[in-house]
């Protein structure tokens, strides 16, 4: 039953963005340590970890964002805001597979991503680069308990 929920396609992703999951210790993906090590050694792929702790997985990462605990939702909003501001969203996909996107987009128009990232105790330029990589390359997302244990866990999920 453990593997019946969505899993990132670690084998076929160029960028794996992880929020609050230490895959080297918490094996909720079959063969997680082996897959994470292989991904981290591949020069054409990126492992990005968002976690306040320098976990075993964060030590493997190409980029580790040591976020201030409890600010994950704020970081995600900043990232969405940057994607929309820079035009990195997949417009064709959104047109073909969504409805009402303009009403969602309007929620981010006046959002101050720089101030949000500062509240997260992260470097704006580094977050902008992580966001660009995630938005413009073949990417997957993995999140786990670390994301769900904060003050805004319902919003995060």
Predicted regions and their residues:
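Cofactor-pocket helix-loop regions in the catalytic cores of large enzyme subunits
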Residues: 1-157
């Amino acid at each position: 039953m453990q593997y019946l929920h969505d899993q990132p396609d670690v084998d076929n992703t160029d960028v794996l963005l992880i929020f609050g999951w230490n895959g080297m210790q918490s094996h909720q993906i079959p063969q997680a340590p082996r897959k994470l090590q292989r991904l981290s050694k591949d020069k054409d792929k990126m492992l990005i970890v968002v976690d306040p702790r320098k976990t075993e997985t964060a030590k493997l990462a190409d980029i580790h964002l040591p976020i201030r605990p409890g600010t994950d939702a704020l970081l995600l909003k900043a990232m969405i805001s940057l994607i929309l501001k820079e035009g990195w969203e997949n417009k064709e996909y959104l047109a073909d597979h969504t409805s009402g996107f303009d009403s969602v987009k309007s929620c981010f128009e006046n959002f101050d991503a720089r101030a949000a990232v500062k509240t997260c105790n992260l470097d704006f330029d580094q977050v902008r680069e992580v966001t660009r990589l995630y938005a413009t390359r073949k990417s997957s997302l993995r999140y786990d308990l670390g994301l769900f244990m904060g003050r805004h866990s319902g919003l995060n999920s």
